[in-house]
C-alpha cells in the first residue's frame, strides 16, 4: 500500500492512500482543501473516500470544499461538529474502503471523539500518537489517554505510524530531557536533525521505534518513572500519573 504526504498549514500532513483503483485515493484528515486539490491534479487522482480522526479544524476544514467539488463518502467519529460526515464509526467497526480492510480504534485523550484507522502494517492515528510524542490533552483524561496509548502499544511492532504533524524534532528534544541516556533515542534524534536540516519529512515512524524512544509510550519504564518523579518532586508510579506528569512537563517546556 502506497501512502503519500500532502503538506498543509505550517506542519500538518494530510495522507493520500492509493487504492485498488489506480485513479482513486483515500484522503485522511484534510484540514485544508487547496493542497489536496493541487496534489490530485498533479497526480491525476480523485478522492474515493475521506477518513477523519477527530473534529479539530486543522483535520476537517477542507472537507466541505473537497466534497463540493467531487462528492464522496466522509467517514469519522460521531460528533455534531463534523457536519460533513456521511458515516460514523467507533471501536470495533470494520470497513472496506478502497479495497482495503480497516479496523476502527477509539483513541480518546487529545479529544473525546478521537479515533484511529488501522490496517495491517499501517496506523493512521491523527493527533493521538506522534513520533517521539503525543497530542495535547485538550478534552480527555489521563486515564483515557493512557488506555488509548496502551491500545496502540499492542499493535505489531512493524506497524508504520502515520501521524498528522511534523513535530518530531521538538518531540525528540523533549524526550531527551526525560531519557538523556537512551541510546536509541540519541541516534534517532540525530537522524531527525539531519532530515529536518534538509527539509525532509520524518514520517512515517514505526511502532517498534516509538516503543524504544517515545516517553508517552514508555510511561511504565523505570527510567521514565524516575524522570517523572524527579520532575514532580513526588512519587508517581501509576501509568496515568506518570503520563500526566510528563504531559504537563512537555506542555510547559
UniProtKB/Swiss-Prot annotation:
Q: Which InterPro entries match?
A: Clx_II_MBL, Glyoxalase_II_hydrolase, HAGH_C, Hydroxyacylglutathione_Hdrlase, Metallo-B-lactamas, RibonucZ/Hydroxyglut_hydro
The residues that hold Zn(2+) 2 are 58-59, 127, 165
Alphabetical keyword list: Hydrolase, Metal-binding, Zinc
Q: What is its EC number?
A: 3.1.2.6
Alphabetically, which GO biological process terms does the record hold?
Answer: methylglyoxal catabolic process to D-lactate via S-lactoyl-glutathione
Give the protein's cofactors: Zn(2+)
Q: How is the cofactor bound?
A: Binds 2 Zn(2+) ions per subunit.
Which molecular-function annotations from GO does this UniProt entry contain? hydroxyacylglutathione hydrolase activity; metal ion binding
List membrane-spanning regions.
none
Q: Which Gene3D superfamilies match?
A: Ribonuclease Z/Hydroxyacylglutathione hydrolase-like
The record's top EC class is hydrolase
Q: In which pathway does it act?
A: Secondary metabolite metabolism; methylglyoxal degradation; (R)-lactate from methylglyoxal: step 2/2
Catalysed reaction, written as an equation? an S-(2-hydroxyacyl)glutathione + H2O = a 2-hydroxy carboxylate + glutathione + H(+)
Q: Which Pfam family is one of those matched by this entry?
A: Lactamase_B
* UniProt: Zn(2+) 1 binding residues: 54, 56, 110, 127
Provide the function of this protein: Thiolesterase that catalyzes the hydrolysis of S-D-lactoyl-glutathione to form glutathione and D-lactic acid.
Assigned protein family: Belongs to the metallo-beta-lactamase superfamily. Glyoxalase II family.
| Subunit structure, interactors included | Monomer.
- Name of the protein in its database record: Hydroxyacylglutathione hydrolase
Q: Which organism is it from?
A: Idiomarina loihiensis (strain ATCC BAA-735 / DSM 15497 / L2-TR)
Traced from the root, the source organism's taxonomic lineage reads:
Bacteria, Pseudomonadati, Pseudomonadota, Gammaproteobacteria, Alteromonadales
Q: Which gene encodes it?
A: gloB
